[in-house]
């Protein structure tokens, strides 16, 4: 299994877990002012379904592929730790790129003081799941060594 596929599969599982946390948070009425899907909808004239699709594209494709690419830069097999660090990276990108675009201010300051902490917690969950699942996929489905075309076949 390729690193890219492992990254996207791990990203899918992590995004599903994060989506469950978002739905649970909304159903419990916690931090209702911090609704990431509503923030995505506010960026343009897109519907809620399209915002969820964007959420999955970023979580599965963008972050999944970036995690797979960054995996080779750090030779540790502590995938859970790589995931947590990557979660902080993804959170920082959200705080300095997405939040200002959504008119929520740097680090979500216009939403309220809890915005930065709550989203950090959610990104740490995402990163932890991403790293653990990627590590499990790496253990169970190691990358195939490329064939050497100069080696004669028997």
What do the predicted segments below correspond to?
Residues 1-154:
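Juxtamembrane/disordered regions of integral membrane proteins
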């Amino acid at each position: 299994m390729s690193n890219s596929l492992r990254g996207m599969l791990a990203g899918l599982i992590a995004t599903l877990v994060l989506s469950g946390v978002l739905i649970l948070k909304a159903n419990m009425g916690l931090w209702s002012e911090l609704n990431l899907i509503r923030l995505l909808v506010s960026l343009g004239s897109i519907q809620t379904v399209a915002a969820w699709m964007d959420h999955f594209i970023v979580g599965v494709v963008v972050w999944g592929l970036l995690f797979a690419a960054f995996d080779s830069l750090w030779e540790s097999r502590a995938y859970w730790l790589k995931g947590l660090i990557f979660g902080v990276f993804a959170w920082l990108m959200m705080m300095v790129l997405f939040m200002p675009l959504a008119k929520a201010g740097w680090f979500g300051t216009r939403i309220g003081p809890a915005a930065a902490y709550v989203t950090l917690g959610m990104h740490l969950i995402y990163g932890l799941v991403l790293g653990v699942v990627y590590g499990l996929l790496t253990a169970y489905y190691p990358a195939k060594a490329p064939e050497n075309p100069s080696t004669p076949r028997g």
